[in-house]
Amino acid sequence: MSGAMPVKRLWSRPDLLSIEWADGTLGEFASLWLRDNVREDRDPHSGQRLIDIADLPENPRIRSAAAHNGTVNVEWEAESRSATFELQWLLAQAADRSGRTDSGLRFWLEAAGLDAARDFAWATFAGARSDRTLRARWLDQLWRDGIAFLSDVPCNDAGILEAAALAGRVLETNYGLVYDVRSVAQPENLAYSDLGLGLHTDNPYREPVPGFQVLHALVASPDGGESLFGDGFAMALHLRASFPDDFEVLTRTPVPFLYRSRDAELYAERPLIQLTCSGEVSAVHYNSRSIAPLRLAARDAGPFYGAYRRFAALLRDSRFHLQFSLRNGDLVVFDNQRTLHGRTAFSSAKHPRHLRGCYLTRDSVYSEAALLRREFHPETHS
């Protein structure tokens, strides 16, 4: 296979196939896992499985395994069949199971030393719409960094929806498909005021939590109203390294989040820091404005509030803030379960400020990125 990583050596025993690639990657594949992933046992059109685990031999034993022309052929002892696996596909599986569930992410803890225009992904709206290679790269960087930007998005009603469609599918909420962020009298949400807002994630009271958020600058304020962003994963990992007990408390304590307005009441409970089954940080949910009274035993109040205060202090630390001014027509997309956002205070009486926003479903952003990756790198999806 052209461009495939060469295999340094391959060996097997009845219960295991082992492959070492030229770059040092070692893949170990259980015989039962290989038997479960035989391509011929899937429908060729949908790719869905045609068999169930109960249809497979309980303990398939490998008779032989041999590499040839970018593939490896595996024969089993008790079955009169063999299966061929693409070595590049097996390499991708080996990388995925390396134990690094955060593989491919770039953390940016001390964001104050970064420059939004220099250190993060930017594309023009027209370029991302017309150049699929550019859009694929932009989406990959969005997943890597948890944030990416577009410029020259038309400042009209349709602009944000046309731009959002380049990343994923818009999630309709009680705010509608889009919402306007500008100051109003007696706001039902402090986002619609002149107040500065500390770093937070949006809608932790919603089920599911919106995966990605989009903000489009229609009228930028020349004085105040600067955007703030911080890498919640990086700060959570910093807390874990420095104060592991506090980190553990925040991962296991359910926090109630509540939103009430004239036309909606939303409630959900989730920890401030959420982990995968393997213990890696998978989401940060932080919005002090929306926390309802906690249901804590008295003995648990001290440890939780101590950990909560310490994490809040991290989020307030300006060393961890990426601060800059969006210009008219700029648009930012960010992971609402990783990248916290906020703003500095401003005076709408002196300088009106108007952003338009929407949310994207997490699975649709993943799908857009995966489809483009598959289009330009088919060898990893064979």
Mark where each language-model region is.
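Motif-centric detector for short Cys/His coordination patterns
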Residues: 1-131
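Active-site environment of non-heme Fe oxygenases that use a 2-His-1-carboxylate facial triad
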Residues: 102-147, 152, 156-382
